[in-house]
Amino acid sequence: MNTLKHLLDNNLAWATSIKENDPEFFTRLSQQQAPKYLWIGCSDSRVAANQIINLQPGEVFVHRNIANVVVHTDFNCLSVIQFAVEELKVKHIILCGHYDCGGIKAALENHEHGIIDNWLRHIKDVIRFNTEKFEGLDHEKKLDLLCEMNVKEQVTNICNTTIVQKAWKQGKELTVHGWIYSIKNGVLKHLVTHDSASKV
């Protein structure tokens, strides 16, 4: 049986290194998490939230799914948003997509993928409502545009949740950001920001 010993060894080396540099790190971490940020991103293994924004464990609360989709029937995602806003009292929600996203590629294709097609329906709707913006573009430009448009659409969905609307009505300091990440160069790009003063 493969027990993934190499990963356990990696963990031990990592924990030892952290303690050598900061002996109280895990003691502090075990007290309570108090992140200022909620990151909602893609499940893609190349897009690791903490590393991309260079934050330590405990500094960012993370939720990931295929193609960073936020829909009002996904109680997993909604529960994460509610906990982050109401219990952790995060100040920022970051919706981060990325170029060359496999979920976005699949949504652009015209063949069946199985159960994931139900999830990709939300992205296909973005295409359907913006058909004219994709006319005349080659496949790569369509893909990049859809990756960006999907981020903006999901930011709108976050802003329209009852959780965020309630927070804004209560005067809570909460800003929702839409970013996109380039796997080719490791750089984030800002696309959109909304707060309680925005009209979404």
Located regions from the model:
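Divalent-metal-activated hydrolytic enzyme cores
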Residues: M1-P35, A67-K91, G102-V200
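Short beta-strand segments
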Residues: I40-C42, R64, I94-H98, H177-S182
